[in-house]
Amino acid sequence: MGLLRKRGDRVDRRRASSWALANPAEYALIFGSPVPGYTAPPDTLPAATRTPRALLQILIDGVRSGALSDTGPAGLPDDVRADFTRIREEHLPDLPEALMARGFLGRTHLFGAVSFEVFGQFDEVVEARDAYFDFQMRQVAELVGL
């Protein structure tokens, strides 16, 4: 979490979670079960990619500032490496493979945690949800290298 503290911005670090809890139906439309045969209109793409882009930008900023470095190969299976190579070439040329892989892992954990809370998976299990969410995100930040 050192890099996040150094960034100096005071954004609400629970923004994705807070929005999802306040707007569960909208969250479900974006991140819930797909509707067979439905393709979202192109104008919805910016909203759907806002959080992933912000997460990746934190990693890119960390690389550019020298606070994050490539830790070598990500250990990706070859077919996944091909996917990530394509994504990096098209959208994220400044992000080393290992950091990109960890960033995607962080995104998966973030939305998994939010989805568990929004869809009631913690009901009658975890009462201190804010504290648990913060704990999860600290663990994910460490895993990602932040």
Where are these regions (language model features)?
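Hydrophobic alpha-helical connector segments
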Residues: 1-26, 36, 45-52
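Short alpha-helical scaffolding segments that buttress acidic/His motifs in well-ordered protein cores
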Residues: 13-16, 30, 106, 110
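Short linear capping/connector segments at secondary-structure termini
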Residues: 31-38
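C-terminal peripheral helix-coil segments that are non-catalytic and often amphipathic
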Residues: 53-146
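Short amphipathic alpha-helical segments with coiled-coil-like heptad repeat character
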Residues: 28-30, 118
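Divalent-cation-assisted or electrostatically stabilized phosphate/pyrophosphate-binding catalytic cores
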Residues: 41-42
